[in-house]
A protein has these predicted regions:
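Terminal targeting segments of Actinobacterial cell-envelope proteins
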Residues: 1-16
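Structural signal for the C-terminal ends of transmembrane alpha-helices
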Residues: 68-76
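Non-catalytic, solvent-exposed segments at the cell envelope interface
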Residues: 109-119, 124-128, 133-135, 140-496
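Membrane-embedded alpha-helical segments of integral membrane proteins
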Residues: 19-69
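Hydrophobic alpha-helical transmembrane segments in integral membrane proteins
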Residues: 95-113
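Internal/C-terminal transmembrane anchor helices
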Residues: 77-100
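Membrane-interfacial loop-to-transmembrane-helix junctions in polytopic alpha-helical membrane proteins
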Residues: 15-18, 48, 75-79
Length: 496
């Protein structure tokens, strides 16, 4: 009898089938993807310990459940196949989460701890000049600014050294003492070409006698240098002590956010993490203030020609404070950020229609004219509408002052949308938009500390704004060669 039962027992023994091996393979895949996700999330330093513990427990339970189902050999394989397919799906979601976490970290690293400052100079000729490239300027006399008048004298010299070999080893130059004299040298034919810092083009266009300079001339060569500024060390008390961020908005032709440029938006953001208060102080771009570098009076916007640290120092001197950090956005970038957020709700103090203005095309290769009408109260705006809303000044009697208020209204709307769960919908688009059009001197560690605070406390920020004003008049401006320009004298009562 024992000999007869022995074959039967052997026949009842269960062996692993392809379904079993599939299940075990999916368990291994699930474990690997879980580990990758956990490592990526921890490396971002954006999540609090509580969030990480919850995620770890969830991952542990998921993996334990799959092991319990897949490890034993079972006669019925349906549960193993279904569980294996579920493991594949979960692994895919975990890999997606890992990629999203890595993308978020890369985007923050790209904008945080900014230490580069880029200076760009152009070789400019008249629009009807036959020269189409720098090689066509052999024998030309190049007009340059004197060293004490040139905001980028080192870059000008580096440009001359760069083109010298291609022009027969010699470059003839003619030195001018101020910006308008340099432009006149080109118009009068005393110089075949001139070398200009990129910021000077906007400055010349703002002068009444040179308002068509950009249309009358053509850039045939561009030369840039970058220098590294001293990085700011992480602030261990950034989530507990007040700090000030200088917010600069530029409207540069170049899409490069690092380039030195006039600063059209100048806002000091005073942030108090403990009380969850943010005070935005807007200062008009035409404020007539002493430059920090030499004490010469100029428009506030012109301070940006010397670098963002100069603009921050000028505002610091004006209000008797010191900006701890700076943040900078290009107007073209503002459009991208708002679109990535699927629009923002902006509160307008007035009903107004914008004067037609140039805004960037979708592909970024050109511009087109746009104009919009905004109602008093809440307006849901896309990127282009928000850009026009923030730029407009000609529709208001107190132009620059109201524009500053509108800019702060847009900033408030962006902060509200970005700090809400709605941001998760377009997470990747927002990251792409921010990383290409926004920089800050806040370190990655500082930003991660603030993000953790937001997640931990679910903070709702109370944002208030304040704008200073003044009396307008015509005064000489240092960066424009002491040309007389319309400026705004600061209101001492408001500032003090």
């Amino acid at each position: 009898m024992n000999e007869q039962e022995q074959p039967r027992r052997r026949r009842r023994r269960l062996y692993r089938t392809s379904a079993d091996w599939f299940g075990l393979a999916t368990v291994a895949l699930l474990m690997i993807c879980s580990l990758v996700l956990l490592v990526q999330l921890m490396s971002t330093k954006l999540l609090t310990d509580l969030y990480l513990i919850v995620i770890e427990v969830i991952l542990l339970l998921i993996n334990a459940g799959h092991v319990i189902i897949q490890l034993p050999i079972r006669r019925v394989k349906t549960s193993k196949v279904v569980c294996g397919l579920l493991a594949v799906l979960l692994s895919g979601l975990m890999l997606y989460g890992s990629v999203a976490a890595a993308s978020g970290k890369s985007a923050l690293l790209a904008i945080a701890g900014h230490t580069l400052q880029k200076t760009t100079s152009y070789v400019v000729v008249m629009d009807d000049d036959p020269a189409r490239s720098i090689g066509d300027t052999v024998g030309y006399t190049f007009g340059i600014l004197s060293e004490d008048a040139d905001i980028s004298a080192d870059n000008t010299q580096a440009l001359l050294d760069d083109i010298k070999d291609g022009l027969g080893g010699r470059v003839d130059t003619s030195t001018c003492t101020d910006l308008t004299s340099l432009a006149d040298a080109l118009y009068d034919g005393n110089a075949g070409a001139i070398i200009l810092n990129s910021s000077y083009l906007t400055t010349l266009d703002s002068l009444e006698d040179y308002s068509t300079f950009s249309k009358d001339t053509r850039i045939i060569y561009e030369f840039s240098t970058t220098k590294e500024v001293e990085p700011i060390k992480p602030n261990a008390s950034i989530t507990s002590q007040p700090f000030i961020v200088y917010c600069s908005g530029i409207d540069a032709r170049s899409s490069d956010i690092n380039i030195q440029s006039l600063s059209d938006v100048n806002i000091l953001a005073v942030i108090h993490p403990r009380t969850h208060q943010i005070l935005l102080i807007n200062t008009p771009r035409d404020y007539y203030v002493p430059l920090a570098r030499n004490g010469q009076r100029d428009k506030l916007t012109h301070a940006g020609m010397y670098g963002i640290d100069e603009s921050a120092a000028v505002l610091g001197n004006l209000y008797g404070v010191k900006a701890d950090y700076y943040a900078r956005v290009n107007f073209a970038g503002l459009k991208k950020i708002v679109d990535a957020l699927d629009g923002v709700d902006v509160n307008s103090e007035h009903e107004f229609t914008t004067v037609g203005m140039e805004v960037p095309d979708e592909n970024g290769d050109g511009v087109h004219m746009a104009g919009y009408t905004f109602t008093q109260g809440i307006n849901h705006l896309n990127g282009e509408q928000a850009l026009c809303f923030a730029r407009e000044r000609h529709a208001f009697g107190d132009g620059d002052n109201q524009r500053g208020k509108n800019q702060m209204a847009v900033i408030r709307a962006i902060v509200d949308k970005a700090s809400s769960p709605a941001i998760l919908k377009g997470y990747q688009k927002v990251l792409d938009a921010v990383s290409s059009s926004f920089i800050t001197s806040l370190t990655y560690e500082d930003i991660s500390s603030l993000v953790q605070m937001q997640l931990r406390d679910n903070v709702h920020w109370n944002i208030t704004s304040y704008s200073v004003s003044g009396e307008g008049g015509m005064e000489p401006c240092y960066s424009a060669g002491n040309e007389t320009l319309w400026v705004m004298w600061p209101n001492a009562t408001q500032i003090n």
